[in-house]
A protein has these predicted regions:
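N-terminal catalytic or cofactor-binding beta/alpha core of small enzyme domains
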Residues: 1-74, 79-126
Length: 127
């Protein structure tokens, strides 16, 4: 990662009320507690208490577009659907994250690193 710990934004996406979509908020809550303990200047957005659901993504995207220069590293974390053999795996890319593909409505988010936990099968791939 480039920059220092003060320049990192961790964006954890998902709905804490939906089991299959709660990976982001679960990790966000854990990271928030850990980051506040170890380095309060790292920003974590999206927790079980304050989740970032699909309906929030346009607002978050606008925020990131305006304030991208404040962060040298943006990490996005979300649950995702994938092939049967990838369920339970974590996929990490040096690229943007396209959230909402599981509901056939993707929203691309600015990020340097995207982390997706495959939580279920994407039945669209089987067609």
């Amino acid at each position: 990662m480039k920059g220092t710990m003060e320049d990192i934004l961790i964006l954890c996406i998902g709905d804490s009320n939906l089991i299959g979509d709660s990976l982001g908020p679960l990790i966000g809550s854990f990271m928030y507690r850990k980051v506040i303990e170890d380095n309060p200047s790292v920003k974590v957005i999206g927790t079980l208490e304050n989740p970032i659901g699909y309906n929030d993504l346009i607002r978050i995207t606008e925020h990131l577009n305006k304030r991208k220069q404040e962060y040298t590293t943006i990490i996005t974390i979300d649950s995702a659907l994938g092939s049967s053999q990838n369920i339970g795996k974590i996929i990490m890319d040096n690229s943007t994250l396209c959230a909402g593909n599981g509901v056939n409505s993707g929203q691309e988010l600015i990020s340097d690193i995207s982390i997706r936990g495959i939580v279920g099968k994407n039945y669209e791939d089987a067609k």
